[in-house]
Amino acid sequence: MAGEPQNTPDFVAVDVESKGGVDRVTFRFRKREGAPDVPPFHIVRFVDELTTDPQGAPANVEGEAFVQIIFQAFGVDLSGEEPVEIYTGPKEFRPRFPTVLEVEELGDFEATISWGIGLSSRACFVVDATPTRITLEFPSAV
C-alpha cells in the first residue's frame, strides 16, 4: 500500500507499451485543485485469480500469473445532475507483449478503481508512483 487517501485525482488514461526490454503499464491522473502533491492511495499485488469489483465474479484475463492494482481515483464525475465519465478510454488491452499479455478494468465503484494484468509468467516488477501517474514495469520475458 502506498500513496495518500487525501489525494483522490481524476483517472484519465491508461498507457501500455513494450520498449527497451520492459513491458510498461501506466495509469494517468489529473490532480484536483487543492490536492496534496502525493500519489493517490494504491495497492499492487499478485493474486491467484482476478475478479470483478464489486461483484466478485471471475474475470477472464489471459495469463499464467496475475497482478491486481487498486487505486483511489474518480472515473466518473458525479458533481452535476447527470454522471459524466472522466475515463473514456478502453477497458481492455490485449498487447500480448513478452510479459504483459492483457490489461483489463475490473471495477470502478465509489472512487475505487481496480485493474488486472495478465502475465506470461510471474515476474518481479517495479512500481513508480507520482501525483499524476502510477507505472508498473515488468522485464520482458526472453
Model-flagged regions — what are they?
Residues 1-142:
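Short linear recognition/processing motifs and adjacent strand/loop elements at protein termini
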